[in-house]
């Protein structure tokens, strides 16, 4: 902390954030209790449902549950709008759905919940129990997310979702260190604050250099892929109106590499899971000089330590770290350079469509 304690974080309520961290820890206990109830009642499949950013956020949990789960566990990531027209053959009245909505009014999710309830499917939500979605699933099936106090990252939502998913795994005998994970991440918000402070000067530098670029590419994989999409689509496309291309490390070499040329910024997000080998291949290509493009940026979550956290848990918190670095701090600094308010929209929520 000594190296970063004097750094101010722009547009960020530090004390409020730590208070939110204490509150989200308590909310996590409620998510754990929901998972216990699901386990005791039994289930044949788990569905993670979202739209847009919430769909992206659930991607990391889908990855983790498939990584740590047994071969009989069925976990599916579904988009509410798509499910409304296509359904899913594996969903039955014994299935369980976890969804999330900050607004509590997402129409596609509301429509899906109505249909699922008619099927007898149990639906749980991370949302305000007094909102439309909360009322649709019932207050006893909701956990309210804490306010963000100026923080634009998704790490608290990740934490709550992980409490649910990892607890289900724990009750199946697949994630025996669940209690240790909860204990070691109880005060992780202090570390997330320190990571913000450490990254802030670099975020400012990157924003000044690339925020006004005509076109930018973002590459990620594994546990970080959902956050890669979320940052590039929800923050830069939706909130900054930037032209973006996001691509996985494994697909990068099957077409997208031909778009590289001098002057095109390329961001590579490197994670800490099996797919890091794929990220390493992309990094080797970017740094080889063969494209003549020197505007590449490597952001590696492994460079950001969390004291007291077991190495086994790094893969779980890596999306939290990336969200802190990009969705929060880099976005705030882009906003300053572009002078484009992150809350301004031309079409989104402006009228019915």
PLM-predicted stretches and their roles:
Residues 1-353:
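Conserved N-terminal alpha-helical segment that immediately precedes and caps sugar-phosphate-binding
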């Amino acid at each position: 902390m000594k190296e970063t304690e004097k750094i101010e974080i722009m547009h960020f309520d530090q004390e409020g954030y730590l208070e939110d961290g204490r509150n989200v820890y308590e909310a996590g206990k409620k998510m754990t209790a929901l998972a216990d109830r699901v386990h005791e009642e039994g289930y044949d499949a788990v569905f993670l449902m979202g739209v847009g950013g919430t769909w992206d956020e659930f991607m990391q949990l889908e990855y983790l549950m498939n990584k740590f789960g047994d071969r009989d566990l069925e976990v599916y990531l579904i988009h509410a709008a798509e499910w409304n027209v296509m359904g899913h053959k594996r969903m039955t009245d014994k299935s369980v759905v976890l969804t999330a909505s900050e607004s509590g009014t997402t129409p596609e999710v509301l429509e899906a919940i109505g249909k699922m309830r008619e099927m007898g499917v149990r639906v749980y939500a991370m949302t305000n129990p007094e909102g439309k979605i909360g009322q649709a699933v019932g207050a006893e099936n909701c956990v309210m997310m804490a306010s963000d106090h100026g923080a634009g990252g998704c790490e608290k939502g990740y934490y709550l979702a992980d409490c649910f998913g990892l607890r289900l795994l724990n009750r199946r005998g697949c994630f025996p260190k669940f209690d240790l994970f909860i204990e070691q991440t109880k005060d992780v918000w202090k570390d997330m604050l320190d990571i913000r402070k450490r990254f802030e000067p670099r975020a400012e530098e990157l924003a000044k250099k690339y925020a006004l670029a005509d076109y930018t590419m973002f590459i990620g994989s594994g546990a970080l892929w959902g956050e890669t999409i979320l940052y590039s689509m929800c923050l830069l496309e939706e909130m900054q109106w930037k032209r973006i291309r996001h691509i996985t490390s494994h697909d990068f070499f099957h077409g997208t590499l031909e778009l590289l040329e001098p002057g095109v910024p390329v961001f590579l997000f490197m994670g800490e899971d099996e797919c890091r080998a794929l990220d390493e291949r992309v990094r080797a290509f970017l740094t080889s000089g063969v494209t003549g493009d020197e505007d590449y940026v490597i952001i590696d979550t492994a460079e950001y330590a969390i004291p007291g956290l077991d190495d086994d848990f790094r893969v779980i918190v890596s999306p939290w770290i990336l969200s802190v670095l990009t969705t929060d701090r880099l976005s705030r600094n882009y906003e300053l350079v572009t002078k484009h308010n992150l809350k301004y929209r031309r079409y989104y929520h402006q009228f019915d469509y």
